[in-house]
């Protein structure tokens, strides 16, 4: 099962993430948990989230990039749900062998994230990659949709279909 942990603080204003979710919903075996809809008060149901994670083979952290990082509710979710003794540490093997895909949208172009005036995309992914590895997850190459503020509808739809294709290819490779 593919579990998408969706963290968009303003989901009604989303163009790119909305299309990505629409494409993902067309696949069988996909569950989407929208953190800002489930927990508008930031009071996360840890047991429910851990139960959802336990059913997943592929976990996707999908969100818009905010200030070169993740939205605050996703950070809190990571801090609370990936707990010691469950996700890491003594006895913390619940996520071992599962896969993690970081699916992120950005307003800037891909070149905006090259080494130079701004941090490189590989650098920006390191905290998430380190978290994944620490929890025994297999880190997959990220999926990034850039220039979302200026893309036309056709481009956004094409990128969303590419996202669906990434998920489908993972399903086919791991479940025949």
UniProtKB/Swiss-Prot annotation:
Asked whether the UniProt record includes Cell membrane among its keywords, one would answer: yes
User: Can you provide one Gene Ontology molecular function annotated for this UniProt record?
Assistant: electron transfer activity
- Enzyme Commission number(s) of this protein: 1.6.5.2
Per its UniProt record, what InterPro entries does this chain match? Flavodoxin_fold (IPR003680), Flavoprotein-like_sf (IPR029039), K_H_efflux_KefF (IPR023948), KefG/KefF (IPR046980)
Q: Broadest EC class?
A: oxidoreductase
**Alphabetized PANTHER family for the sequence:** GLUTATHIONE-REGULATED POTASSIUM-EFFLUX SYSTEM ANCILLARY PROTEIN KEFF (PTHR47307:SF2), GLUTATHIONE-REGULATED POTASSIUM-EFFLUX SYSTEM ANCILLARY PROTEIN KEFG (PTHR47307)
User: Could you identify this protein by its name?
Assistant: Glutathione-regulated potassium-efflux system ancillary protein KefF
Annotated organism of origin: Shigella flexneri
């Amino acid at each position: 099962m593919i579990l998408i942990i969706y963290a968009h603080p303003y989901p009604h204003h989303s163009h790119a993430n909305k299309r990505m979710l629409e494409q993902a919903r067309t696949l069988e075996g996909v569950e989407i948990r929208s953190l800002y809809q489930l927990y508008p008060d930031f009071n996360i149901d840890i047991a429910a989230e851990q139960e959802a994670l336990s059913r997943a083979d592929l976990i996707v952290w999908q969100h818009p990039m905010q200030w070169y990082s993740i939205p605050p509710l996703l950070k809190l979710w990571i801090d609370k749900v990936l707990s010691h003794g469950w996700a890491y540490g003594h006895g913390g093997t619940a996520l071992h062998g599962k896969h993690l895909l970081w699916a992120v949208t950005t307003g800037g172009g891909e070149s905006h994230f090259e080494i130079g005036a701004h941090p490189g995309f590989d650098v920006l992914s390191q905290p998430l990659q380190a978290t994944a590895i620490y929890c025994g997850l297999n880190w997959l190459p990220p999926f990034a949709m850039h220039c979302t503020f200026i893309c036309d509808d056709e481009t956004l739809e094409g990128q969303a279909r590419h996202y669906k294709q990434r998920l489908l290819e993972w399903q086919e490779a791991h479940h025949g």
